Every structure is written in C-alpha cells, then in structure tokens.
Amino acid sequence: MSNEYDYLFKLLLIGDSSVGKSCLLLRFADDAYIDSYISTIGVDFKIRTIEQDGKTIKLQIWDTAGQERFRTITSSYYRGAHGIIIVYDCTEMESFNNVKQWLSEIDRYANESVCKLLIGNKNDMVESKVVSTETGRALADELGIPFLETSAKDSINVEQAFLTIAGEIKKKMGSQTNANKTSGPGTVQMKGQPIQQNNGGCCGQ
C-alpha cells in the first residue's frame, strides 16, 4: 500500500454489541460479508484509501471488537479520532435507545470537534424492522448529525456512509485551516494529531 496520501483520518465504529459494526467494517474495507462474524476481545482496525475532491484520504477505521459488552472501552480508544460512526440495529429497539448513552461516552472522551454519523444497520431485514427511517432521521436531526440506513449484508449505503463522514471531516478541517490563516500560528489542527500504527490486538477472522 502506498504511503502517499493527503489526509489520514481515524474513524471509530461504536454502538451496542451485535449491531453489525464488524460487518460494516469488513464490507467497506474488504467488500466481504460473514454472517456469523465472531469478534475477539480487543481492538481491530482496517485501512482503506479513498479519493475525494482530488485528494487522497487514508481511513484508519477502528472497531471495538466486543469490548462494548463489558464496558471496557476507554478514553484511549477515542483519543485522536476525527470521526465517529454510531451504529444501531434497525431490528433492535434497545440498540437505538442506547444511542444517547454512546453519545454521552463521545462527549466524555472524544475531541469536542469530532464529526459524527448515525447509522441504522440491517436495513435489509424489512419484516423485522422496529426502528423506522423517520425515527432514526428525527434523532439525527435533533443531534444535528448526518443519518443513513445501511445493510452490510446487501452492501447498501456502506460505501456512502464512510464517504459521508470523510467528507464531513475534510470540510471541517478546511474551515479550521482557513481559521488558522486568519488567527496566525499557534492554533492546533485536527490533522496534527498523531495516529499510532499499531497492528497488535487485531481481531481474528
């Protein structure tokens, strides 16, 4: 993989266990789907490079790999994140009700300027759907963040989800860069946050 890129964005996938975070990551990074995806305890991440507006963006996407079941997600997971995707299961109301709890975690640990995206996954399971599109969108509107419904299984809106949050981060960084030009040196850009390339603790597949 080439090391040539204009931006390096750290993205997080958070949400209740079994909402399909690992499946979304696998679909976007490898264009694959495993129905019985089993996460090991740890933190897994995958990398994919995309092109957007003539810029090369390297996305480093982190998955909690089962830690959310034990509430062991720590501040180190959120540190340096540019974007966070909050995922719920369209067929599981409890996972939707817990979204605000995850948002409070973000507020507690993440950078206040972090970009957020709300995703309702498993949208292909129409007959089992209990969280309507309107309900999901209403919450996203209340929070002032983008919203998409996805299906990792049928590859619906998965690509669009990651492109959307990458675009939001790039747009925010552009506005910060302009602010830096007017305010002079000494301001800190999101791009300046170091990201450790640590391949340890990858979840087994």
Curated annotation (Swiss-Prot):
GO MF term set = GTP binding; GTP-dependent protein binding; GTPase activity; myosin XI tail binding
Q: Which InterPro entries match?
A: P-loop_NTPase, Small_GTP-bd, Small_GTPase, Small_GTPase_Rab
Per the UniProt entry, the disulfide pairs are none
Biased composition, class Polar residues, residue ranges: 174-186, 194-205
Q: Kindly state the positions of the motif Effector region in this protein.
A: 37-45
Please list where the region (Disordered) is annotated. Answer: 174-205
Instruction: Name the SMART domains on file.
Output: ARF, RAB, RAN, RAS, RHO
UniProt keyword annotations, A-Z: Acetylation, ER-Golgi transport, Golgi apparatus, GTP-binding, Lipoprotein, Membrane, Nucleotide-binding, Prenylation, Protein transport, Transport
Q: Which GO terms describe its cellular component?
A: Golgi membrane; plasma membrane; trans-Golgi network membrane
Q: Where in the cell is it found?
A: Golgi apparatus, trans-Golgi network membrane; Golgi apparatus membrane
Q: Which residues form a coiled coil?
A: none
Question: Lipid (S-geranylgeranyl cysteine) attached at which positions?
Answer: C202, C203
A single GO BP: endoplasmic reticulum to Golgi vesicle-mediated transport
- Family, as annotated: Belongs to the small GTPase superfamily. Rab family.
Summary of subunit composition and partner proteins: Does not interact with GC5. Interacts with XI-2/MYA2.
- Protein's name in the database: Ras-related protein RABD1
Q: Which organism is it from?
A: Arabidopsis thaliana
